[in-house]
Amino acid sequence: MKGMIIVNVDKCNACKSCEIACAVEHSVSKDLYQAIHEDPTPRARVSVQQGVSFSVPLQCRQCANAPCIALCPTDALYRADPDSPVLLDEEKCIGCNWCVLACPFGVIYLDEERKVVFKCDQCFQRVQRGELPACVSACPTGALMFKMLEEIPKERRNAYLVEIAECLTGGGV
């Protein structure tokens, strides 16, 4: 059951609803009004990056041979099974930053306050319950979609990754 969060940069208006939904989903209370008072404050695992003519929500791309997993000295980053997203065991994380440096997309972050990293887990528990990731559910324009890999032709997957890479390096869109 390998899924992927797909971004249509033409539909993203940088409203950041995905960021808010993500932070709330990863809060203790799961409620916006309570989450803003939690300590530590919940953090979004998706970040909307704005270019000159486009915006793109960025989150973990769930690399097949994830360098973050390979470099983690404590095995805090792992896959529950071969088809699961890259997950984080915060109890094992020592905040060494190796995964942050290794991530080719720059989407693993260090929580300075707690001295542990945080990253997108594709709302693994929500997806297991048959729900969409919080960012996808919250997107008012449909710029974010969650698709199973078998639903996406290989050519489209490759074209999508090239498109995102071009956006990140200043080319394209």
Please give the residue ranges for each predicted region.
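N-terminal beta-strand motif that seeds the catalytic metal site of vicinal oxygen chelate
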Residues: 1-10
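Aromatic-flanked redox-active Cys/Sec active sites in thiol-based oxidoreductases
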Residues: 9, 74, 90
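Flanking helices and flexible, charged tails adjoining ferredoxin-like Fe-S electron-transfer domains
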Residues: 2, 28-62, 69-70, 90-92, ...
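Ordered, amphipathic secondary-structure segments that act as subunit-interaction surfaces
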Residues: 62-80, 84-85
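Residues that cap or initiate secondary-structure elements
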Residues: 11-13, 126
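N-terminal signal-anchor transmembrane alpha helix
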Residues: 13, 17-23
